[in-house]
Design a protein with these regions (language model features):
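Small, basic N-terminal interaction modules of short regulatory proteins
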Residues: 1-71
Length: 71
């Protein structure tokens, strides 16, 4: 089963989300408005990073909802 990794760095004000192995990261492409796409060597997106991320309520927990494809 695939895992999603969510990393929030409150000091660096970044939110990074990987839906594939972070070790596959080879290329980062800034696409605008503080969004960076993280790609593997083949150019497939394995995650993204949001710069200047400040949650509206930092004391709130981050809720992650996974939608699994139906078979």
């Amino acid at each position: 089963m695939a895992q999603i990794r969510v990393i929030h760095d409150p000091i660096g004000e970044t939110l990074t989300i990987y839906w594939d192995d972070p070790e596959r990261e080879e290329i980062c492409e800034e696409v605008g408005q503080g969004i960076i796409l993280i790609k593997d060597a083949q150019g497939e997106i394995v995650g993204f990073e949001r710069l200047y991320f400040r949650p509206s309520n930092p004391s709130q927990d981050l809720e992650v909802i996974l939608h699994m494809p139906m078979r």
